[in-house]
Amino acid sequence: LLLISAMVGSMIAAVPEEESLQLSEDERGGCLPHNRFCNALSGPRCCSGLTCKELNIWASKCL
């Protein structure tokens, strides 16, 4: 029983860590470094470094 309660506690503790990662992405302007694009909430923009920039109208490249 103690083992089960410890497992449930660790699962609950893992959720705030994921939320804090989400917050850090939002603080950086919604940048997703693994695919070099911004998250959907940022709109149609792509990443350059740690900030998001508007897409060029004629090409899908960062300005």
Swiss-Prot record:
Transmembrane segments: none annotated. GO terms for molecular function: toxin activity. Expressed by the venom gland. Disulfide bonds join 31-47, 38-52, 46-62. Residues 15-28 form a propeptide. Pfam families: Toxin_7. Residues 1-14 form the signal peptide. It comes from the Eukaryota. Insect active toxin causing rapid but reversible paralysis in crickets. No activity shown in mammals. Does not show effect on mammalian voltage-gated calcium channels. The presence of a 'disulfide through disulfide knot' structurally defines this protein as a knottin. Belongs to the neurotoxin 01 (U2-agtx) family. This is U2-agatoxin-Ao1v. The lineage of its organism: Eukaryota, Metazoa, Ecdysozoa, Arthropoda, Chelicerata.
